[in-house]
A protein has these predicted regions:
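Conserved, mostly hydrophobic/aromatic
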Residues: 1, 5, 32, 40, ...
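Alpha-helical elements of Rossmann-like donor-binding domains used by nucleotide-donor carbohydrate transfer enzymes
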Residues: 3, 27, 31, 58, ...
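Mid-to-C-terminal alpha-helical segments outside catalytic/metal-binding sites
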Residues: 30-31, 155-158, 169-208
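Active-site gating/metal-coordination segments in enzymes
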Residues: 1-79, 207
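Catalytic pocket-lining loop regions of alpha/beta-barrel enzymes
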Residues: 38-39, 52-160
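Short alpha-helical
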Residues: 23, 116-117, 141-142, 167, ...
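Flexible, active-site-proximal loop/turn residues at the rims of small-molecule/cofactor binding pockets
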Residues: 46, 137, 165
């Protein structure tokens, strides 16, 4: 990934991943940052980690020192028997709030608007400036959400467009069409589409 980032400089932003709890995970992560990767991506359902563990604290500290953001799938859904752990035991907005309090200098993004605790995560972005959410899948009608997500209810400077492309069960542009059709201002649309991501990943926007 770091080689791709160098090859396509200013066009590709690469993320690192490690397995929390593996030997020297923080050292591996530091090497990834030194190679040019711009943040850490984790998925609690797949990697089966407790975000409040000492193993994670070492990774948080590495990100803090290097001023790198974290994209962390810690919403409880989608739950699957294919996972080796129970997401409902590992994931919650309440558990994340402890991380936000203990590491206020780290930017953290939770995908899927934190589904299925979207209301709790919406409240958290009002309370903590170091939390972002992304829209992946939840502004379509794919997930069984009661009522349509209204982006006007959210803090517009803390929501990012997300897609999960190419691993999605619908057309690649479906979420983009939903976003474009949303009843939001042009300012909010620009923030959600790209400006908030540039802020989160510390990407310098190039003049068009």
């Amino acid at each position: 990934m770091s080689e791709k980032c160098r090859k396509y400089e200013n066009r590709v932003t690469g993320m690192a991943t490690v397995f929390p709890g593996e030997e020297n995970a923080d050292i591996i992560l530091q090497e990834a940052f030194d190679s040019g990767l711009r943040g850490l991506k984790l998925h609690a359902h797949v990697q089966c980690f407790d975000m409040n563990s000492e193993h994670m604290n070492r990774l948080y500290e590495c990100c803090r020192i290097n001023k790198k953001p974290i994209v962390m799938h810690i919403g409880r859904e989608p739950k699957s028997t294919a996972y080796g752990c129970d997401p409902y035991q590992l994931c919650s907005a309440e558990k994340l709030e402890l991380v936000l309090k203990n590491f206020p200098d780290i930017k953290i993004c939770v995908p899927h608007l934190g589904f299925d605790e979207t209301s709790a995560y919406r409240k958290l972005i009002e309370k903590y400036d170091n939390l972002w959410l992304d829209t992946t899948m939840v502004i379509t009608d794919y997930f069984p959400i009661e009522g349509k997500i209204n982006l006007n209810d959210y803090r517009s400077d803390r929501i990012m467009y997300g897609s999960d492309f190419p691993n999605i069960p619908y057309a690649w542009d479906r979420e983009l069409k939903e976003l474009n059709a949303a009843d939001i201002s042009m300012d909010s649309l620009e923030k959600i589409s790209y400006k908030n991501a540039a802020d989160f990943f510390s990407i310098k926007l190039q003049p068009v």
